[in-house]
Amino acid sequence: MRTAFCLFLTLLAPLAQAQMVAPDVLVKGITDEVAATIVKDSDIQGGDTKKAADLIEAKIVPHFNFTRMARIAMARNWRSATPEQQKALASEFKTLLVRTYSTALVNYKGQRIDYKPLRAKPEDEEVTVKSEVKPSGSTQPVSIDYELEKTPNGWKIYDVKVDGISLVTTYRETFATEVRERGIDGLIKSLAAKNREPLGSKAGKS
């Protein structure tokens, strides 16, 4: 499935080391590592989204800036949130993305990923790593761009665009509606409730 595969790829580009390695090198390196793990893991290939989520938590989550991602998704409503609410929003947003993309990760079957040359200056604080993917059964490549920021702990991903569409800002309208109707606490409760729902997969298989 093209959409599921693209969603999976959005979480395949974290930093392998805290040292300041070139962002495109890091993206390719960790993508290759995670992709190889998936292909060899019969449980994930068989649809075990719990195991897929564990892989995401271990290999990918530490290298995303979920606070900035939540801030982008919340837009102007972020400024109205207290520090405690902001922390809760970032946490629930992280869990939501992990759960969402773990169901997509099991669809990866070794599709080819090509990377574009990085166009950035040494002093740049933010860069875009561009790639193209050729999903199985499709002749049309899918562009996937990773937006990264330089931090004291290395490069962190704060957004991903699939065919030019941000997978973070796609939540903006839904979040705005929730805040308008139920307030920020209502949005947090709504996200928490969704995150408590069963994954609806072969999770838990041992």
At which residue positions do the language-model features occur?
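Low-complexity, intrinsically disordered terminal/linker segments enriched in charged
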Residues: 159-206
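Surface-exposed, polar/charged faces of alpha-helical domains
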Residues: 21, 25, 36, 40-47, ...
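Early exported N-terminus immediately downstream of N-terminal targeting peptides
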Residues: 20-101
